[in-house]
A protein has these predicted regions:
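Short acidic-glycine-tyrosine-enriched beta hairpin
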Residues: 82-103
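Generic detector of solvent-exposed, compositionally biased contiguous segments
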Residues: 30-60, 98-101
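Short histidine-centered beta-strand/loop micro-motifs
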Residues: 42-43, 59-65, 82, 89-90, ...
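Glycine- and acidic-residue-biased ligand/ion/polar-headgroup-sensing regions
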Residues: 55-59, 64-84
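Ligand-binding loop in jelly-roll beta-barrel domains
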Residues: 91, 102-126
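A short, N-terminal "cap"/entry segment at the start of jelly-roll beta-barrel domains
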Residues: 1-45
C-alpha cells in the first residue's frame, strides 16, 4: 500500500494553535492535522491527526467510514458506546489502541474530563 505523506522531522506541535471541528462532529471535538491529506471523494490518501475532546462533550450516533483508522489514546478519559444522551458506555484510559477496517461502526464517544487521541486514517489504494 503506497503511503504519500510529506517528510517531517521532529518539530514542536503547537497544541494551543488552530484546532478545527471536523465535518459531522459536534462543537467541542476538534482536530489538528499533523501530516497528509485524505480525499474522501476520490478515496485516496492518508492523514495523521490529533483529535481533542473538551470535557463533557459527546457524540450521539456511531461513525462508519470507508477508510482504515488507527487510534491511540494519548491522555484523558474516553467512553465508548454511550447513548444519544451521553449516558452509559465503557470507559478507557490513556495508552489504549484501536484498529478499524473500513465499514466498521464505532462509537458514540464521550469524554468526562477531556481527552486527546492520535489517529491515522488511510485508504488501501491497492484495491
Amino acid at each position: 500500500m503506497p503511503i504519500n505523506k510529506e517528510h517531517k522531522e521532529f518539530y514542536a506541535v503547537d497544541m494551543g494553535g488552530e484546532w478545527v471541528v471536523p465535518e459531522g462532529y459536534p462543537e467541542g471535538i476538534k482536530q489538528k492535522i499533523l501530516v497528509g491529506t485524505l480525499d474522501e471523494v476520490n478515496k485516496t490518501g492518508c492523514r495523521t491527526r490529533l483529535l481533542k475532546f473538551e470535557p463533557g462533550v459527546y457524540t450521539t450516533a456511531p461513525f462508519t467510514h470507508d477508510y482504515w483508522e488507527e487510534v491511540y489514546q494519548l491522555k484523558g478519559d474516553l467512553i465508548v458506546g454511550n447513548d444519544e444522551n451521553g449516558d452509559g458506555g465503557r470507559s478507557f484510559d490513556p495508552d489504549t489502541y484501536a484498529c478499524r477496517p473500513p465499514g466498521t461502526p464505532h462509537g458514540p464517544f464521550k469524554s468526562v474530563n477531556g481527552c486527546v487521541l492520535l489517529e491515522s486514517h488511510y485508504y488501501d489504494e491497492t484495491k
